[in-house]
Structures are given as C-alpha cells and as structure tokens.
Amino acid sequence: MQWKLVLGCVSAAFLAMAGSAFAQQASTPPYGPAITLDDAKRAMSAAELEAAKNAWQVAITILDSGGNLVMFHKMDNTQLASITASEGKARTALTFKRPSKALDDAIAAGGAGLRLLAVKDITPLEGGLPILVDGKIVGAIGVSGALSSQDAQTAKAGADAVAK
C-alpha cells in the first residue's frame, strides 16, 4: 500500500516538472490593436532581408492581433510545405501569447507537455513570435523554410523591426 503512495507522489512530481516547461507565464502581454500595414511592411522587409543575407529560402506570414492575414511572402525556391507552416507558427505564437518554440520545448519534454498535441490547429515548431508594440501583442510573425533556429532568427529580425 505504501509503495502505491510513493509511486503516486513520484508520478505527480514528474508530471508537474514536465508541465512546468509550458507553465502559464505569471503575466503575458495583453492583445492590442491590429498591427498597422506600415509596421507589417517593416517587419516583413526586415525578416526578408535577414533570410536573404543568409541565403535562406523561407515563407513569411504576418497576422494581426485578431488572427487575420496581413502579409505573406514566399521567397523563390521555398519548399511548398513552408507556406502553411509559416502561418501555423504565427498563429500558434499569437494564440498562446508566446514564441511557438515554447510549445516545441514542452512537447519535447514529454510528460504533461504531450497534452498540447491534442490542441487543434497548432504548429509547435520554432519560428513563430508575437509582435509587440507598447507592450501589447499587435500581431505575430511566422517563418518556415530553413532550420528551425534560422526560422526563429528571421522571425526575430521582423518582430524587432517594429518593437517599441
């Protein structure tokens, strides 16, 4: 009987640790007004420049704070799967108010993080970031086509171009 209690405590501790990889942040930024077209163009240009200077062929998606498509670019010779992946990464970052890599990490950690796989229409891969202006989420950018870390680097260049 006592071993069941110990096993239960160990299991609970393991699940708590695995779930902490994706614990709700104490304070996530609120949603703000939709990203302006000028800011979206600035983010897109910066992301495209980052990808081009590194010879990465990527697809780049920018959504507004309501999840609506504002801009999309597919660079020459980008694999077709990157079209939907870039939008999925942006949508994931927007709906979870955090980089899409946070979900990637939570799932990779296993345990309770695997529950994220049950969430419909997420793309838990690195390369999606919320776009913040004045501390509010005005949209998100998603990039796909290179290595995930390179996608994230490209997305960061775009998000940083409009961050205030």
Where is each model-derived feature located?
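Bacterial N-terminal signal peptides
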Residues: 8-20
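Flexible, solvent-exposed loop/hinge segments and secondary-structure transition points
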Residues: 22-164
